[in-house]
Curated annotation (Swiss-Prot):
CDD domains: S1_EF-P_repeat_1 (cd04470), S1_EF-P_repeat_2 (cd05794). It comes from Caldicellulosiruptor bescii (strain ATCC BAA-1888 / DSM 6725 / KCTC 15123 / Z-1320). It is found in: Cytoplasm. The keyword Glycoprotein does not apply. Its main location: cytoplasm. InterPro entries: Elong-fact-P_C, NA-bd_OB-fold, Rib_uL2_dom2, Transl_elong_fac_P/YeiP, Transl_elong_KOW-like, Transl_elong_P/YeiP_cen, Transl_elong_P/YeiP_CS, Transl_elongation_fac_P. Keywords: Cytoplasm, Elongation factor, Protein biosynthesis. This is Elongation factor P. Coiled coil: none annotated. Pathway: Protein biosynthesis; polypeptide chain elongation. The gene is efp. GO terms for cellular component: cytoplasm.
Length: 185
């Protein structure tokens, strides 16, 4: 059991006899009245997204989720193909199931495939990835303003904010959960 006040992104719960994954949550403490948690929940079977408000002390049962490490092979335009590195079994998932999970994932990287009772419903990227910057504005001598950033496109096509000293060809480390630059590699 988990309290609504402890919700976080990616958590899977049982609600109304269905399995839902928490996509977004917001703890709200109004000036008048009791606090509440506003959430967006995705039904893992249908893909439907609902908005629901809970009291922070409401308790929900956690759904048991199976996690399998799989290698991302390729995308054929419609489907994304993954292979279990232990059994060499391959599965294909559509864009809806994958979502933005592969935003920072290159072919042959290892990802976690999520399933419930044998039904695959999502993909989790590795927490940290190292990618090469393929396009960004050049930094100029004297760009020393603290905290200044610029957009940079990495080899997977995703765009993130990086410090001014990062140039094309640099390898950078990215936190995929926050989509933020961490360091130069």
């Amino acid at each position: 059991m988990v309290e609504a006040g402890d919700f976080r992104r990616g958590l899977t719960i049982e609600y109304d006899g269905q399995i839902f994954q928490v996509i977004e949550f917001l703890h709200v403490k109004p000036g008048k009245g009791a606090a509440f948690v506003r959430t967006k929940l995705k039904n893992i079977k249908t893909g439907a997204v609902i908005e629901k408000t809970f009291r922070p002390d409401e308790r929900m049962p956690l759904a048991h989720i199976e996690r399998r490490e799989m290698q991302y092979l390729y995308n054929d335009g419609e489907l994304y193909y993954f292979m279990d590195t232990q059994t060499y079994e391959q599965i294909a998932l559509n864009q809806e199931m994958v979502g933005d999970a592969l935003k920072f994932v290159k072919e042959n990287m290892t990802v976690t495939v999520l399933s419930h009772n044998g039904v695959v419903f999502g993909v989790e990227p590795p927490r940290f990835v190292e990618l090469e910057v393929i396009d960004t504005e050049p930094g100029f001598k004297g760009d020393t303003q603290t905290g200044a950033t610029k957009p940079a496109k990495v080899e997977t096509g995703a765009v993130i904010q990086v410090p001014l000293f990062i140039n094309v060809g640099d390898k950078i480390k990215i936190d995929t959960s926050t989509e933020e630059y961490l360091s130069r590699v």
